[in-house]
Amino acid sequence: MRPMIKVLYIAMALALSCVVPAHSMSMQELQNTSRFEMLHGFGESGNGDGTYIDKDSIKASNGPNGTKQIAVTQYVLMPAGDTIQEKNVLYTFDTKQSFGNLIKRLESHQLGSYKELWLFKQKYSGVTSSVVDFKEYHIDGNRYDTQSEARDRRMATAPVDFGFAGYLLANRLYERMYGVQFDDVVGK
């Protein structure tokens, strides 16, 4: 009787693996311009060959303490490893730290000089990000091995340092959602 139960469990596992659809991502799919947009010059991890965003995934919301948040799914092509990294990223924008608001603080003498403003902006860009979910695929669309994916997930970031690619990407997303660049936002 025991061998029959083992066979039944194996058969059920095989049947379920055929029924449950698996999501994958390939380079060919990223070429679908109606769903994905390539953002030139935004290789997030230094050796990336381009960042694609899923246009349907972009969602804006109000965050804590008056911040704005934008969630987006990004695909970063990593040609050195023939892989595609899928990152679900949550960007949080503190509009009190936009250039427009910092200049307003300078004019009201809350900041001493343009140099102080510039150093403040470099220290705290006003934009933070967190990688909410991470997956890795071979360029042909097959899922990457889970051990390598777990290692790469720990290294996966979406940096938003002022003046660098991640900050420019965040600004572009903000403009797409709100019609104005993040640094042009001025509070009342």
PLM regions and their residue ranges:
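Bacterial N-terminal signal peptides that target proteins for export
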Residues: 1-9
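Bacterial N-terminal signal peptides
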Residues: 9-17
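N-terminal secretory-pathway/extracellular module detecting exported/lumenal segments
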Residues: 23-88, 92-188
